[in-house]
Amino acid sequence: METIHVDLAERSYPISIGAELFCNPAHFSSVIPAKKRVVVISNVTVAPLYAQQIIDTLNTFECQVSLLELDDGEQYKNLDTFNQILTFLLEENHSRDVTIVALGGGVVGDVVGFASACYQRGVDFIQIPTTLLSQVDSSVGGKTAINHPLGKNMVGAFYQPKAVIIDINCLKTLPEREFAAGMAEVIKYGIIVDREFFDWLDENMDKLYALDHDALIYAISRCCQIKADVVAKDEKESGMRALLNLGHTFGHAIEAEMGYGNWLHGEAVSAGTVMAAVTAQKEGLISQSDVERICSILEKAKLPLKAPKEMTVDAFMKHMMRDKKVLSGKLRLVLPTSIGSSEVVTGVSESVLAEVIEQCKA
């Protein structure tokens, strides 16, 4: 098992990464006191697979546990689901000493984290991510949010969990399409800051898709370590944390325009990463060979390289100008400058962006 620490002074917390963690009380009792009231919140897909294991483990130190199952899908990461959680907590008369466990993928983690941040001005919560994407990205760092019809993650808060518990055995029940979506975020880390990790991924893609234990532990641990280091330096995304959004400005536009859930987040990020790389090449920031390597590894990971053909330039620009990185009306893009290096760029012209969008559509 690997343990990584997110260093945020009094709000620091551990990330535990291994196998068979759900049945080990030690991973829970270190952050949840005995006899505590606990609410496990999952979705209708994940709860039947893993909720009872966790409830049984919590019962070993006499926690009082209740379970809430949410609908499954990005389209449910909304105000209605947020209110459903708050209503459940109120109807069960939970006070500020409750601990909430978010069991599921990125949607569950985001909406449950946001509800935890808001309920009685903040209660403890633990992230138990069950998808590759949530294990390497969304469960770590304290970003919580729900979507708005006009934009993704537009309503939310920075709110850190008390712990993150990652059991790689969950990936055995994950559909390959979802695994591939997670690989988009894994590859992102190599592109933005770690060329050596990028090279390792390129060489070990088959092992990862075969769910090789050691390969998964290494890849997930490396992603979490990179993110933990970035978050420790820039928790509220005032500087370098923005680099973690490579591909997301274009990608969020795809998700919003095509309807949440029709394109998986990682699929949209993959197409968005290609668009960012092509933009960087047109701006003279990255070599053609590095762009080709980025496209090659995404294709090897069974991810889309092209944006949907029906999306117009106007549709992209409408959504991109609502991006949270926009400052003073100016679009800021995370662009790779080489494999292992990236920067935030302001001032890419609309004509260049229009060229990129047309070039990168299916």
Swiss-Prot record:
Keyword Lyase listed: yes
Location within or outside the cell: Cytoplasm
Molecular-function GO term, any one: metal ion binding
Sequence positions that bind NAD(+): 72-77, 106-110, 130-131, 143, 152, 170-173
CDD domains registered for this protein in UniProt: DHQS
Enzyme Commission number: 4.2.3.4
Named cofactor requirement(s): Co(2+); Zn(2+); NAD(+)
Function: Catalyzes the conversion of 3-deoxy-D-arabino-heptulosonate 7-phosphate (DAHP) to dehydroquinate (DHQ).
HAMAP family for the chain: DHQ_synthase (MF_00110)
Protein name, entry field: 3-dehydroquinate synthase
Organism: Aliivibrio fischeri (strain ATCC 700601 / ES114)
Organism placement in taxonomy: Bacteria, Pseudomonadati, Pseudomonadota, Gammaproteobacteria, Vibrionales
UniProt gene name: aroB
